[in-house]
Amino acid sequence: MYGVIFHFLREYVIERHGGKATWDALLKAQGYKYKMYFPVQDYADEEIVNLVQTASKALNVPVPDVLEDFGSFVGPQLLTFYHMYVKDKNMKTFDVIEVAGGSIHDAIHQHNKNRKPPRLSAHREAPDVLMVHYQSHRKLCPVVRGIIRGLGEKFNEKFDIKETQCMYDGADECVMRVTKLL
């Protein structure tokens, strides 16, 4: 897992769930007295899975809900981190999601050929409907839903997100129909 995600997870826990003491408690539960995550380094997927599961138990919130809330937090953060791909100031949520599926994930893979970023693609079915396709061995579709919601909050847009197929139900990929609400 790309280190920037751990960085964002730390910021998420600190901002939304009790501050640095909560983050330190999560690390301690994983057997770390102190741990620093570097944005461009790779870490084992299991490490973030364990952190999220520990957070879920501590917060008494189901893992998918923690992941979706994390996604809503991280969506706007990703705009800042990958600002070079989102140069058009008139871009809105659908535009950003369309760009993310190509340029951003290509850039992640280009820096390290061993990285396995998710496959993400999106196309407009209508001006107010975006079809989002997500595939990853990590099965983090709740994060994708959250990112869409978080970007929507940033751009003052609201969406109805219907998952028409999901990897958790045996599908090869998750497909989300995202409808912009007026």
Annotate each language-model stretch with its function.
Residues 22-31, 67-73, 88, 160-168:
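Short alpha-helical "patches" and their helix-cap loops
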Residues 21-59:
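Long amphipathic alpha-helical segments
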Residues 129-182:
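C-terminal non-catalytic interaction appendages of large macromolecular assemblies
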